[in-house]
Amino acid sequence: MKIFEIQLGNSISPVKLGMTETEVNNVIGTPDCIYGHRHHFLDGLMVDFDNEGRVEFIEAAGSELFSTTLLGFDVHRTLAANVLERIQLEGSYDHSDPELGYSYVFKELQLSFWRPTLPDLEEGEGLYFQSVAIASEGYFE
C-alpha cells in the first residue's frame, strides 16, 4: 500500500499544489476519470485545477490503495476526535462553518476534514473522517 504524506501548504505526496496537469500525470499517472476541473486517481485521490490549469485543491478519501498520513498518523484510521485534538495544536478550525460536525476547516492551515455523518457511538458511524484536503492559499476564504 502506498503512503501519501500531507505536507501542509505544499502537497499530498506526490501531488503538489501549483503543479500543472502534465506534472500531476507524470507523478501519479493518468486519471481514472475527470469531472470538470476535478481529476480522480487511485480510487480516492482527487485533484482540482484552477482556471490557469494549476493544482489548487488536493483531497484524499479513505482508500484500499493508499493511506494518507499527517504529522505521523493515518488520517483515515485515527479516530476523528483524536485527529482534531492533534491538529488544534497547529491551528483552530472555523467554528462558524455551517457544516460543522461533518466538516472542519482550518483556514490558516488551508486544511479540511470531512465525514458524511455525525458521530454515533452506538452505531459506530462517523467516528473517522472520510476525507482530508489541502488547498492553495486563500481557497477556504
Language-model region placement:
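Short helix/turn-capping signatures at newly exposed starts of structured segments
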Residues: 1-141
